[in-house]
Amino acid sequence: MDNSTTAAEVSAPTDYDYNSTSYDDDNPYAAPCSLTETWNFLGRFAPVAYILVFILALVGNILVLCVIRRYRQSRHSPCSFSLTDTFLLHLAVSDLLLAATLPFFAVEWISEWVFGKVMCKITGALFSLNVYCGVLFLACISFDRYLAIVHAINISWRRKTCHAQLACAFIWVICLGLSMVDMHFRDLVEIPGMNRMVCQIVYSEQYSKQWQIGMQLVSMVLGFILPLLVMLYCYLHIFKALCHATRRQKRRSLRLIISLVIVFVISWAPYNALRMTDSLQMLGVIVKSCALNNVLDVGILVTESLGLAHCALNPLLYGLVGVKFRRELAQMCKAALGPQGCLGLVGWANGRGSSTRRPTGSFSSVETENTSYFSVMA
């Protein structure tokens, strides 16, 4: 596969080779691979997938931010709520910014890139920045839950959420540096024979393959492998700490832990597996073929869309499952629509049991004060 054929650029929505044919760089005399059918399918699939993820992520994450804002208004200090809530706030912002880039790339697939070179660079960098930030914030949430439940870290330390703000700032800075690859290399490219402009990463011809493979490796390590290892380690120990619990809500938390890991793996593992296959093909470990080219082109974009859907699922997995989060959402609804307009939501917020049931917090030895207001364990 040539350097631009595969939809596997590291830190941007799928960069696809819009040529109608693809040639093997190692054998220039080989018959070209036809990409017409692949292009037609992706041109129909990508806009629908991007817009659907955009709408769902927009609604879910705005709800999360509104509920957090309502809660913060009742506090006076920027360090007034738990570490997990701080990470959840930054996760929602990151997912919202990521979703905001998708309509631009949907328009590109429908027609062409019409927003100019500057927006091409900014949009690509913003996408890259928030993909990295999102998965790293997920790792931070799991680590904070691990400290609270398994080790019951000192309450006074964990309530100083300014520590979490510093950690979040560090993550933003690191990911901003990684996104500069897009800012530097993204450019407008004209599709031969189609008179259309697209926004793609364009590496220097001499080092194109090295850059692609190197950045794919960085992306897989920071964007999937490292967060997955952190989540597996933390949630495995949380699972062990709660596996002997008898309370119904603790058993419910065990099911939630399993769901969090499974959803993350299903969302991102297929995409990273296909990108690894593409890297091996570029290195010559896997023999190139037209059939494999088409599988990678279609598969990477489809699985990328599956991964992007995770930013729409995060509000459900990390926010709405918390009893107290749902109650705050119900109160916000009552304030906006009145008590009669939110009867169903109030019942849902109180759970299946009695509406007068006392809310429980995190399942640690410091249950009351160590609770995350929007914790997945609440």
Swiss-Prot record:
Gene: cxcr3.2
Name by which UniProt lists this protein: C-X-C chemokine receptor type 3-2
A GO-annotated cellular component: external side of plasma membrane
Membrane topology designation: Multi-pass membrane protein
Membrane side Cytoplasmic: residue ranges: 69-86, 143-164, 234-253, 326-378
UniProt topological domain (Extracellular) ranges: 1-47, 108-121, 186-212, 275-304
Protein family: Belongs to the G-protein coupled receptor 1 family.
InterPro entries (alphabetical): ATII_rcpt, CCR1-9-like, GPCR_Rhodpsn, GPCR_Rhodpsn_7TM
Phenotype of the disrupted gene, per the record: Viable with no significant effect on survival. Macrophage and neutrophil counts are normal. Macrophage migration in response to cxcr3.2-independent stimuli is not affected, although the basal migration rate is reduced. Macrophage migration to sites of bacterial infection by S.typhimurium or M.marinum is reduced. Dissemination of bacterial infection to distant sites and granuloma formation is also reduced.
Glycosylation site positions: 3, 19
Localisation: Cell membrane
BP GO annotations: calcium-mediated signaling; cell chemotaxis; chemokine-mediated signaling pathway; immune response; innate immune response; leukocyte migration involved in immune response; macrophage activation involved in immune response; macrophage chemotaxis
Claim: Membrane is one of the keywords in the record: yes
GO MF, one annotated term: C-C chemokine binding
Originating organism: Danio rerio
